[in-house]
Regions:
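Donor nucleotide-activated moiety binding/catalytic core segment of transferases
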Residues: 172-187
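C-terminal amphipathic alpha-helical segment
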Residues: 226-280
Length: 371
């Protein structure tokens, strides 16, 4: 898949999903082989997002793949799937030489006309990727899944999925299975707003998957119901930053990693060779304030996920891997991570079990936890 002038999205691309106010800081992290950037508006400012993109491309000479996500499907004022695309939004992406993503509204669980509408309207636009911001029932429920994959096959256009969930959508039963069904439709598939499961998607054939810089960009947060009359408004509570803990393939609070480390001073498990940690134990960030650890936590996480991607899908010799090798390796990594989680006394991330259950058979049996 290519944009007319922006760098090509090659198979197995691991993107960073950030908001426009983070884009300049994220650009260096996203500029390496097999990486790239997805940028969503900061506080719904689409004009600001376009200006940021123009700056990145023209002044900053950003050379990795760049995608713009209008995110009109998100937030309290989100638009429904039936909302028409904004022709100016589509045109501006084209003028910037970028891959074109539709500015789709949200596809609720009962909204088959909305789903079909997005795909039909995309099919008549040359070289455009249909953004599908989905209620998780579209992947979880067998009947929904059949309808979804039927419409995707019929339209035959590339799709970029965004999955709604309070936390990790891949923790929900049926979501991994549903994603694999979409990947089996034979259209180029991207996954936006994701976390560690981005790697699973890439190993199973997604063209690209994007990992969010902050929790709010690692899934589509459901709209909160309006407060009950007379209920006390609860204030905004900032979320303490989490970081990817490589042995358990999961995002963990830095404090939780530090506590586990005190109980088990095992250098093999806690040392991190990423460019941010530079050989230090990963909980070095615990000494920083929540505010100061946000940037290193994000950079560490992206670097670790990029390294894992390179190990699972070696970019220098992709054709040497027999088909299914990456998916089998991913299943084996999930089994190992589940074992490591139990060893540390943590609940394993539920997605680990779902990926193993639906991965290539026999892989888990071949897994031996690393010494
Ligand atoms: Zn690190």
């Amino acid at each position: 898949m290519t944009g007319p002038t922006n760098a090509m999205i090659t198979d197995g691309t691991l993107l960073v999903h950030c908001s426009a106010n983070q884009a300049l800081r994220c650009a260096p992290v996203a500029e390496r082989p097999g990486a790239g950037l997805v940028v969503s508006p900061h506080q719904r400012d689409e004009a600001g997002l376009l200006a940021t993109a123009a700056y990145l491309l023209r002044q900053r000479r950003f050379e990795a793949p760049l995608l713009l996500d209008a995110a009109r499907y998100a937030g309290q004022a989100r638009l429904p799937a039936s909302a028409p695309f904004n022709p100016r939004w589509l045109r501006r992406q084209r003028e910037l030489g970028l891959p074109v993503l539709t500015d789709s509204g949200y596809v609720d669980s009962g909204d088959e006309p909305g789903l079909a509408g997005i795909l039909h309207r995309t099919a008549v636009l040359p070289g455009t990727i249909a953004v599908l911001p989905l209620h998780p029932a579209w992947l979880q429920d067998r009947l929904h899944r059949t309808v979804l994959t039927g419409h995707i096959r019929a339209a035959g256009v590339p799709v970029a999925l965004v999955l709604e969930a309070g936390r990790d959508p891949f923790a929900l039963p049926g979501v991994v299975e549903g994603l694999l069904a979409v990947l089996g439709c034979g259209v180029p598939t991207l996954l936006l707003r994701c976390d560690v499961s981005a790697l699973g998607a890439l190993c199973h054939g997604a063209v690209a998957a994007a990992v969010g810089t902050v929790a709010g960009l690692r899934h589509l947060t459901p709209r909160t119901p309006p407060p009950r009359p007379g209920a006390r408004p609860h204030g905004f509570r900032p979320v303490a930053p989490s970081a990817v803990f490589r042995p358990t393939l999961s995002y963990r609070r830095i404090g939780a990693i530090a506590r586990a480390h005190r109980g088990r001073p095992d250098p093999e498990l806690f040392g991190c060779a990423c460019t941010v940690c530079d050989g230090r134990d990963v909980d070095w960030m615990a000494a920083l304030s929540d505010r100061d650890r946000e940037v290193p936590a994000f950079e560490h996480s992206i670097r670790v996920l990029q390294d894992l991607r390179d190990e699972l899908l070696p970019r220098d010799r992709p054709t040497e891997q027999p088909p299914g090798t990456a998916a089998r390796s991913w299943t084996a990594r999930c089994a190992d991570a589940e074992y490591r989680s139990r060893e540390l006394g943590w609940d394993a991330a539920p997605m680990l079990r779902h990926w193993q259950r639906h991965g290539p058979t026999g892989a888990a049996a071949a897994t031996r936890p690393a010494a």
